[in-house]
Amino acid sequence: MKQLFATTSRGFEELLKVELTELGAQEAKVVQGGVHYQADDETLYRTLLWSRLASRILFPLIETKIYSDLDLYAAVSGFNWLGLFDERVTFFVDFNGTNQEIRHTQFGAMRVKDGIVDYFERQGKARPDVDKIQPDVRIHAYLNRENLVISLDLSGEALHLRGYREDAGQAPLRETLAAAIVLRSGWQVGSPLVDPMCGSGTLLIEAAQMEAKIAPQLYRLHWGFDFWKAHNQSAWEKVKNEAIELAEEKQREIQPHFYGFDLDHRVLKKAQKNAQNAGVSHLIKWQQGDVAALKNPRLNEVGTVICNPPYGERLGTTPALIALYSVFGQRLKKEFCGWNVSVFSSESTLLDCLRMRASRQFKAKNGPLDCVQKNYQVSERKSDEITAENELEFNRTSEVATDFANRLQKNIKKISKWAKQQGLDAYRLYDADLPEYNLAVDRYADYIVVQEYAAPKNIDENKARQRLLDAVTATLHVTGVETNKLILKVRQKQKGTNQYEKLANKGEYFYVNEYGAQLWVNLTDYLDTGLFLDHRLTRKMIGALAKGKDFLNLFAYTGSATVHAALGGAKSTTTVDMSNTYLNWAEQNLILNDIEGKQHKLIQADCLQWLEKCDRQFDLIFVDPPTFSNSKRMEDSWDVQRDHVKLMRNLKRVLSNNGTIVFSNNKRGFKMNLVALEELGLSAVEISHKTLPLDFERNKQIHNCWMIQHI
């Protein structure tokens, strides 16, 4: 009997023990990260060929304590490697673990390699070559404190590499993990299995191979024991031939009852190819389809729905995921009454959107992600009862979620009517009206943007996350917007250039209407959309004041105020901003509104430096500086409270005798230094109340606005 060790992912050790025991292993003992067991030659090969959960199967050679790299070298160089393989083979060393003496795994691997090749030289043999790509022999070393175990890796390549997956989707499951999910799902061999978001098909393929009695390594060509001198070829051939015969016999008995659905036809083609390589293509029916229209393919039977849907670190955006999980739960309760359901995800809060109570749950790792697998039993109820429940479901999230939905609905009724009368299709529907829901909801034509303000540090992260899920679910329901047209952003206090930080690179622009102006917006690539909605009335006022005047737009952002000034009949416009991105955006806004000519200048510059050097005058100036900035492209930091008087001194110099400055900023509690302005010869009148539109009247501190003129 040989002493062996099978490694596996953490959390799967007990499952692996059961599997190995069923394959004939003796004295199986669970430890963290694997299972020790004993096996004769046939059982050894059987576990290699048939284990669906083991990552590697190791044959320990050296177990000792080491206290230095010299001890490591001595232990390795003193072993009888010629009894294991000859000098003509290639080898590679996998080294795992460190201690105070062996601080780097590469150093540990090098010392093991040195010990092996030096042993062969001392025996008068040639030095065996190292091959990192496809070695004939793989040596596995594990160091835990002073405890060293060196083993022969009988697997060769890791056992999760079944050989059937030529291609995969964007976020494939490792095959060993997929097998564990199937085994934990409660699925019974012989019953239907449905994966509504199957991706490259790994879950279904693993299950189909289980039912078809196809050994997971049946098609493997290279093994870690191929050049092992103790390899028992006759025992291996017996075990492999038994597996081939069993697979051929079983395949004739099975009827297809595996079903894979996915929205992406391209990934379905990959799944079909993978199933063909795995020998189970005739057992699985593939169909392109949206989970929102999911139908039960086996109405008269009871089976299992198994799924690894997208989650935060995988694919999609959060609003789409919330909607996806919500509609998935609805379809399950409508179409799969009495069925078992097993869902694997890294987002426990997303699983809450299913609105189902789990009967069992298991923790697991998917790479670096902490994940959970939850099993559910769908109750047996009539479909009309389920439909009625789904209609009211969003109201059940919590009492506050109902309040949020009601408030949003009330605001929509009031604001949408007003916006239509004003000729607006970009406006705010909700702005942290309820303290429990600290977010803003904006409409941009057919799109909804939900901006989540950062939660205070004393608010539990999971609680805040759940409230956000509830709010997005309610927003989808109340507005009726399509899930791909709801954009979610997390807004935090901006520091320096963070306000201009790029979030994505989709490049998706469309225009909205504002008092006769058309303005480009981008809802995904930046934290801001290109249009400050709270300044809408300010821009309208600028348009009304601009006729026949030379207009300056300083800190211009995307130039929306310039558009209004030009449409209002400005004699000339000068638009200044430090960002090339936003200046190009401003240019496109001008083009969109047929505003062209040399009298409309766009200048990329540090606004403060440009202003100091400016030698012309303007009749109307709009300046909307940031609250704070420390951009590397600016010589000094900027603080609107600290520096606004200096700014006004420079603006006064370029302001014509009868000119007007419209000055605005977003600093809460901003105090205009009226005494200092008077000393400069300027008078300032606050007009904030006149520039707050209806959709922002609930937040009177969102900005402050001033009209400034020569005394």
Curated annotation (Swiss-Prot):
GO CC terms of this entry: cytoplasm
Superkingdom of origin: Bacteria
Gene3D superfamilies listed in its UniProt record: 3.30.2130.30, RNA methyltransferase domain (HRMD) like, Vaccinia Virus protein VP39
CDD domains in alphabetical order: AdoMet_MTases, THUMP_AdoMetMT
UniProt catalytic activity: guanosine(2445) in 23S rRNA + S-adenosyl-L-methionine = N(2)-methylguanosine(2445) in 23S rRNA + S-adenosyl-L-homocysteine + H(+); guanosine(2069) in 23S rRNA + S-adenosyl-L-methionine = N(2)-methylguanosine(2069) in 23S rRNA + S-adenosyl-L-homocysteine + H(+)
GO terms of molecular function: 23S rRNA (guanine(2445)-N(2))-methyltransferase activity; RNA binding; rRNA (guanine-N7-)-methyltransferase activity
SMART domains for the chain: THUMP (SM00981)
Enzyme Commission number: 2.1.1.173, 2.1.1.264
Keyword terms: Cytoplasm, Methyltransferase, RNA-binding, rRNA processing, S-adenosyl-L-methionine, Transferase
Subcellular location: Cytoplasm
Enzyme class: transferase
Domain THUMP: from-to ranges: 43-154
Function: Specifically methylates the guanine in position 2445 (m2G2445) and the guanine in position 2069 (m7G2069) of 23S rRNA.
Family designation: Belongs to the methyltransferase superfamily. RlmKL family.
NCBIfam families with a match to the protein in the record: PRK11783.1
Full protein name: Ribosomal RNA large subunit methyltransferase K/L
Provenance organism: Haemophilus influenzae (strain 86-028NP)
Lineage: Bacteria, Pseudomonadati, Pseudomonadota, Gammaproteobacteria, Pasteurellales
